[in-house]
């Protein structure tokens, strides 16, 4: 059975980072990356200007739908957090899906 990692991170149009990089690397390892976007950005925050579409209100929808599907994850990886409110969403996600067999990797990036 293919291992799965929930990847909680942003998607940036420019910048070679976040979900764009994580999905590629995780997939190359033969693991299914299951992205849960925290935000969609026109470019990563290191650019002089960018547009950020905050996904805080959508994060719990992902959690609920994946829970209804009976999904489980071998790993949970968190990256860019767009707002303080997302921290609570991430804790709720971890409370739902984390088990003693789940690898948890927290990259403390908060924009």
Role assignments for model-derived ranges:
Residues 78-111:
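Conserved beta-alpha-beta core of the PfkB/ribokinase-like small-molecule kinase fold
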């Amino acid at each position: 059975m293919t291992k799965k990692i929930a990847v909680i991170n942003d998607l940036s149009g420019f910048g070679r980072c976040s979900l764009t990089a994580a999905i590629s690397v995780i997939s190359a390892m033969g693991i299914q990356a299951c992205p849960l976007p925290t935000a969609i950005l026109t470019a990563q925050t290191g650019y002089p200007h960018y547009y950020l579409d905050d996904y805080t209100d959508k994060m719990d929808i992902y959690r609920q739908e994946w829970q209804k599907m009976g999904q489980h994850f071998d790993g949970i990886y968190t990256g860019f957090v767009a707002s303080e409110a997302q921290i609570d969403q991430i804790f709720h996600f971890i409370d739902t899906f984390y088990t003693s067999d789940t690898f948890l990797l927290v990259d403390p990036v908060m924009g």
